[in-house]
Amino acid sequence: MGFLYIDGHVRAYHGKHTISQTFVARRHLAMPATTDYWINDRAGDPLLLITGELDASLTKAFPDLLREVRAAVGERQVTIVFDRGGWSPKLFRSMIRQGFDLLTCRKGKTRRIAERRFVHRRAKLDGHWVSYDLHDQPVRLLGGKLRLRQITRLCEDGDHQTQIITSRWDLRDIELAYRMFERWREENYFKYMPEEFLLDALVDYRIDPQDPTHTVPNPQRRALDKQIRTARADLADLERQYGAAAADNSEQHRPTMRGFKIAYGKLGQQLRTARERLRKLLDQRRQLPKRVEVRDLSEQTLVKLATERKHLTDLIKMLAYQAESDLMNFLRPHYPRAEQEGRTLLHELFATAGDIHVTEDELQITLAPLSSPHRTRAVQILCELLDQTATVFPGTRLRLRFAVRPPPLIGLAFPGTPAHRGAASAPSRPRNRTF
């Protein structure tokens, strides 16, 4: 549990109640939604789940998340891995003071590093070889008060560079880069669970009242921010035009500034109008508070979805996923394509018909063959491994015994070996009969 991955997962809401809006990245728009923050281990398996408060960004959710992590792991030193959504040097300093290490990607523009300064690294991690072109250096944030380590990866195209920030000085740069880019495991979890376990399903219709005094960013100010960005872009474009006209002005035709202003009076008027518009927008924004209370946003009562049943069903789904992952670990050494289709094989196994026979001390389960011989053989090995666990059926003293009926030697789905096919297709010889 040396590395824990934290990220938010947004659940869109399509019901009739009025709940807060959240930006849903996969739909590229803001809509009624709830954000759940998941904490996964380095294999991508879930450990903890916290439902975020109204309009809580990852940086604002971190204090609660860290308290839950500390309660779960005790005083052990763990490294928290997260994306740019949690970028905050002040947060980093607070995490380090609480005994956590951090690993994240740097946000914002940084100076490009010369390609010749990168070093090729190659190592075997988690059983497979990885290689990166890396540059390692110390950096200072918060005006030099916070010293961290920056590892930059040069991508294969030779153009893009990714900066990784960490407080870990004891590990090799290639291992830290590998752990950072292993975030795809958590992303895969967010993709897999809604499809296979209905993670985003609405499990009940209960609602809880939202705290009316809770503050959120002022939507009017947010709308003004958009207008100000547009006004600044328009002003910058007019200033470029006016500057270009001044640079190209011929002194033989217009030797004085007065003549230039008269000649470009229309453009000058547009420039002054744009400046005045920007000034008014900035004045309007200064008069608006940055945050407002929820009760001031709408006449409708803002509510939030109840979490008790949702968390209970999520817990059951987490356990089911963990059991599936444990079966994957049993299967992996005996099924070459386990990473690509191992879970698909397990889904077929779960839906396979079978026979149940009860004896005095055993519950014997014999499954039908799967869709292909190589899958059937893999499941046979899995059954043997499960038998070795000596698992007892809950509430009884019956030991579970698993088996798979062997596939038929000949058939459309199981054509058998060439020898079997030859034997089956060979004409039968007449038998000698004695009288």
Task: Report the location of each language-model feature.
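Active-site-proximal, Lys/Arg-enriched surface segment
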Residues: 1-39
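Short, conserved catalytic/metal-binding motifs centered on acidic residues
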Residues: 2-11, 44, 77-87, 102, ...
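C-terminal accessory/interaction regions of large nucleic acid-associated machines
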Residues: 273-275, 280-435
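An anionic, glycine-rich sequence signature occurring as long contiguous blocks
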Residues: 51, 93, 97-189, 194, ...
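Domain-level cores of phosphate- or acyl-group-handling catalytic modules
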Residues: 56-57, 61-113
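Charged, amphipathic alpha-helical linkers/stalks
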Residues: 189-250
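Extended alpha-helical coiled-coil "stalk/arm" regions
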Residues: 234, 238-292
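Electropositive, glycine- and tryptophan-enriched low-complexity nucleic-acid-binding patches
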Residues: 24-73, 161-162
